[in-house]
A protein has these predicted regions:
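Short, solvent-exposed loop/turn segments at the edges of secondary structure
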Residues: 2-4, 40, 196-198
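Divalent metal-binding acidic/histidine catalytic loops
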Residues: 52, 64-340
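Catalytic palm subdomain of template-directed nucleic-acid polymerases
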Residues: 1-29, 46-56, 133-140, 234, ...
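Short, conserved secondary-structure transition motifs
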Residues: 31-58, 88-89, 269-273
């Protein structure tokens, strides 16, 4: 027996898709054809006249606002926030801080924010992950950060991710890291995670974001170069399987591709030291302690399947995944990555 739910079929034209559905029905499979896709797993899908696709989740944002007891649109006095978080705020455990009053289900809100971030809203990835770190023992400062984020989401509820493929671009990945960004020199003993760095990366195909992540590193980096190199390694763990999948699809002549998929990956990083480490196999006394697992991608670089490129800090699209950024930077990166 085989049961499936919410399945998608994609093809170069509707005729082939309709034929597949007919063949499956002939095989006595109970299938309901819902027609052209408009909604999938809570994500609104709007195909526009210019060929772009707009993905958004306004209903989930409405649910978050309801859970926080925020008034509906146009009602009540709710201050608007134009950034997901305060640009100067770094959340910590704050063990001696004011207790959270329990006015909303913190864990439930975090679950909704995580789903929203992973599907359509990379602009909230950093602060959503930061708030999620304190789910077991949330404090008042963490609840305030969630409410700030909710006011930003209320202001941008109908926005999401705009996909507009650019045929001249293949697989690209932007990697950035914030070295020991949570470090609290006044109380390092209160939160051992403050010594950890955070990396973020965005994986794109034809200019469209596919995967993004904001992640606290498990290893303690000893320098900014190390933290960036760790970020490169983790990002390419996700990129390499994508490249292998594209290679198989190209080999099998998959009809879903109107043009042959590009198998080369460009990686963009703003740290020259990390790029040099990624390119060379030479023994280096200062980096010999790095785990061998971090070097897994070097053969791909040697073969030319992955090329490494220096990018300026302003053009580092993953910057807003590693720390709170100023409004001017947010607007620029959000337009570049999300299309609005």
């Amino acid at each position: 027996m085989l049961y499936t739910d919410d399945s998608l079929l994609a093809g170069p034209d509707n005729g082939e898709i309709e034929q597949i559905i007919k063949d499956l029905k002939k095989a006595k499979l109970n299938i309901t054809d819902e027609g052209d896709i408009q909604d999938f797993l809570g994500v609104n899908i709007d195909t526009r006249e210019d060929g772009s696709i707009h993905l958004s989740q306004p209903h989930l944002i409405d649910q978050i606002l309801k859970d926080l007891k925020f008034p509906a649109d146009g009602k009540g006095n709710v201050a608007t926030k134009v950034t997901p978080a305060k640009s100067s705020e770094i959340l910590k455990r704050d063990k001696d801080g004011r207790e959270f009053d329990g006015s909303f289900n913190y864990r439930s809100i975090i679950g909704k924010l995580n789903y929203l971030e992973k599907c359509t809203r990379s602009d909230i990835a950093y602060i959503a992950h930061q708030c999620a770190r304190f789910t077991e023992e949330p404090k008042d400062c963490h609840a305030k950060a969630i409410k700030w984020l909710a006011r930003y989401l209320r202001h941008t509820k109908d926005q999401g991710l705009i996909l507009k493929p650019q045929k001249n671009r293949g697989v690209e990945v932007y990697v950035d890291a914030d070295f020991s960004g949570n470090w609290d020199p006044e109380a390092p003993h209160k939160d051992r995670d403050t010594a950890r760095s955070r990396h973020g990366y965005i994986i794109m195909y034809e200019g469209c974001p596919m995967i993004w992540k904001s992640q606290l590193q498990t290893e303690i980096a000893l320098s900014s170069t190390e933290s960036e190199y760790i970020g490169i390694s983790y990002a390419l763990r996700e990129v390499i399987p994508i490249m292998e999948l594209l290679r198989e699809m190209k080999k099998e002549n998959f009809p879903i591709f109107k043009t042959k998929p590009k198998l080369h990956c460009k990686l963009f990083e703003d740290n020259s030291g990390a790029l040099e480490m990624a390119k060379t196999h030479k023994y280096r006394p200062r980096t010999k302690h790095l785990n061998v697992k971090l070097h897994h991608f070097r053969d791909y670089v040697t073969r030319g399947e992955i090329s490494l490129h220096k990018v300026g800090t302003k053009e580092q699209l993953a910057d807003y995944l590693t720390k709170p950024v100023l409004l001017e930077i947010l607007l620029y990166l959000r337009l570049k990555v999300m299309g609005w």
